[in-house]
Amino acid sequence: PAVIIVLVTGIVFGLVQGFLVAYMDIQPFIVTLAGMFFARGMTAIISKDMISITNETFMAWAKMKLYLPFGGYLNKKGVMVYPYMYPTVVIALVFLVLAFIMLKYTKFGRSIYAVGGNEQSALMMGLNVRRVKLKAYVLDGFLCGVGSILFCINTLGGFVEQAKGFEMDAIASSVIGGTLLTGGVGNVIGTLFGVLIKATIEAFITFQGTLSSWWTRITIAALLCFFIVLQSILAMVKKKN
């Protein structure tokens, strides 16, 4: 029941925010920022303390390892060791593939690109821009619910301050992966590479040992600024040509 409640809550959040953006013409940044503050405030009302997950199914999924049939090697004891993945990673990759197919090969996916690129052109093409926006926000809310479930499986708990600042990490990863902030350009594969680049930087700084963890934020911020400036330059060149 808890999983269903989380998914439904995500859909409701997406529906409300999508309605405010698409039909009330409120700025998306304001709507989503207010929604984030509202959701975080509601979690604080529910509990300000850490809530541990003791459900046996969740705990089993958190400990489960899916071994890959390739890439094995002999350890020092002469035992063959194979690489493995956690179920949450596999589920995330499945959703990644589905999102790629949806955006690239379906009418709804192409409509999202059209609306993101130029709303007026999309209207002239006969697209129902408001409906496309609403559907996109509902889908986003559902995926946020899925992501929160996977995150809780990994951490086996929930806390009001959990995932604080992840919204900026998501924006940075998307921009580094080639998504234009002006809309209409980007794909989930590029975003995946953006996430991997960010994770590589974090791992390097962590294992380097002599650098403060704040250097991660500084490096990501510098990369974000660089790619935004690069996008602006490319847009100016394209417009000039």
Region roles according to the model:
Residues 14, 138, 143-144, 154-221:
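Transmembrane alpha-helical segments in multi-pass inner-membrane proteins
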